[in-house]
Regions:
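Active-site phosphate/pyrophosphate-binding segments
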Residues: 78-115
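Glycine-rich phosphate-binding loops that contact phosphosugars or nucleotide phosphates
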Residues: 1-73
Length: 115
């Protein structure tokens, strides 16, 4: 709600079906109801997808969440690949990472002093 007050756009990754079965938050809303964009990962209530001896195991939200978020990052990177300063931290194990990351921090430190 603080983000809404500050006019900051929000995105959530959640299971709408699972959320509808869970108790309401203290705001009487569910996560997908208060974000500007929600991505439904379609995970069933209970977050388990494998039946072993009539016991559901195997949380799926970790797998789908990681896949969805990394797919979004890859696509954003593809869209922004021609920017003067590539707006992503590069792993320190990659060539030119320090140079890229230093430029990135310098450019964005004014709006994010934690860099």
């Amino acid at each position: 709600m603080i983000a809404k007050e500050k006019k900051i756009k929000t995105i959530s990754l959640t299971s709408v079906k699972y959320s509808k079965k869970a108790p309401l938050s203290n705001l009487n809303k569910r996560l997908f109801e208060i974000t500007d964009i929600f991505i439904d990962n379609k995970i069933p209530p209970g977050d388990a997808i494998i039946n072993i001896k009539n016991n559901m195991v195997g949380p799926a939200s970790t797998i789908t969440g990681s896949f969805i978020l990394n797919s979004i990052l890859i696509e954003v990177g593809n869209i922004l690949k021609n920017e003067k300063i590539f707006p992503f931290y590069i792993s320190v194990n990659m060539p030119n990472a320090k140079e890229n990351n230093d430029k990135l921090e310098k450019k964005f430190r004014k709006i994010n002093p934690h860099l």
